[in-house]
Regions:
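FIC/Doc superfamily catalytic core
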Residues: 1-342
Length: 342
């Protein structure tokens, strides 16, 4: 029996006592992260958010087996946020559409969710109306049965069968009403529930996983009361996709007790916050370095190369390496390096 076949299936239950420790850990890390971010200037915050959103978009797509060009996504995000001096890689129309969805969603986290908005976001993921070469329904709830399967043709394994199409409208009305109005538990728990609930309805023919993660981000943004997003769960899920799909399948075959799902979700979020802390530390160190070096006259090549090292480049630098990275002659590279040493 699948979870949606049970009576009152969305009356989810969880053991608060078993979740207290991990939820407190997540709350503490959220507080520490935003505390450190308070010392960053506005421009640095925007750049940090741009990098986080880039990773979120790329890895959320990769979870579904869709590979996006990181430089294209980064360039599109930077342009839409008004960030200058970013390596320009012309993004495709598709990448621009996906980036626009994410920025609209988290930038307007306090606005009401609607069916029309969800349908528009899903359509943006499939501008040509195809997925894996097959024509699909876009911009509307699905009208066909949906089976989640894996394996080779003839040896498929069914992991989950979503609710019948006739139920989707009423199921989604209930979900959207809950999403817009329920504040009975913490934002972390609501974020975990939103993810599970949405993918269990599976309202669209494709794109449900990515939409579920966007909806989770919106609830976290509401909890943080900030459109600035500095951490994302997609990067961590992508590192262990098998665990993600296993815990999701187990919960969708369960009896409505989602304690294990929330625990996994919060633990994954905790790891995401650790990664964000590392990113913010890099940005803070970089900011402090340039404050101290503000009186030193540097050419653009030197500035670019120093930024490269401040961003974590660890290879030993030689005049040959410098010339290659800075796209200059070896003699020019030698002068640049000697000038910095002096």
């Amino acid at each position: 029996m699948y979870i949606h076949e049970r009576d009152n299936w969305t009356s989810f239950r969880w053991d608060t006592a078993n979740l207290t420790a991990i939820l407190e850990e997540v709350n503490r890390k959220q507080g520490m992260l935003y505390g450190r971010l308070s010392s960053l200037g506005f421009d640095s915050k925007v750049k940090a958010m741009a990098e986080n959103i880039t990773y979120d978009i790329v890895y959320s797509s990769e979870i579904e087996g869709i590979r996006l060009n990181m430089d294209e996504v980064r360039s599109s995000v930077a342009r839409k946020l008004g960030i200058e001096n970013v390596k320009c890689t012309a993004p495709s129309h598709y990448v621009d559409s996906v980036v626009a969805v994410m920025l609209e969603a988290v930038g307007n986290y306090n606005l009401q969710l609607t069916k029309e908005k969800l349908c528009a976001w899903q359509a943006a993921f499939f501008p040509a109306g195809f997925s894996d070469g097959c024509k699909i329904e876009t911009g509307q709830y699905r009208t066909n049965e949906e089976h989640i399967v894996s394996g080779m043709f003839g040896r498929e394994r069914i992991h989950y069968i979503a609710p019948w199409p006739e139920r989707i409208e009423s199921e989604m009305n209930k979900f959207i009403d809950w999403f817009n109005h329920d504040e009975s538990c913490s934002s972390v728990i609501r974020s975990a529930i939103a993810h599970l609930w949405f993918v269990s309805i599976h309202p669209f023919e494709d794109g449900n996983g990515r939409l579920a993660r966007i909806l989770s981000d919106i609830i976290l943004a509401r909890g943080d009361k900030s459109e600035f997003r500095f951490y994302n769960i997609s990067s961590q899920i992508n590192k262990d996709k098998n665990h993600y799909y296993n815990i999701l399948e187990k919960t969708q075959h369960g009896d409505g007790d989602i304690t294990e799902w929330i625990s996994w979700y919060a633990s994954t979020l905790s790891l995401a916050l650790d990664e964000a802390e590392t990113t913010v530390s890099t940005i803070l160190n970089k900011s402090m370095f340039w404050q101290k070096a503000s009186s030193i006259a540097l050419n653009q090549r030197q500035t670019d190369m120093l930024n490269l090292f401040l961003d974590g480049y660890e290879a030993k630098i030689t005049s040959k390496t410098w010339a290659s990275l800075a796209k200059c002659s070896k003699d020019t590279a030698i002068r640049d390096i000697q000038d910095l040493i002096r």
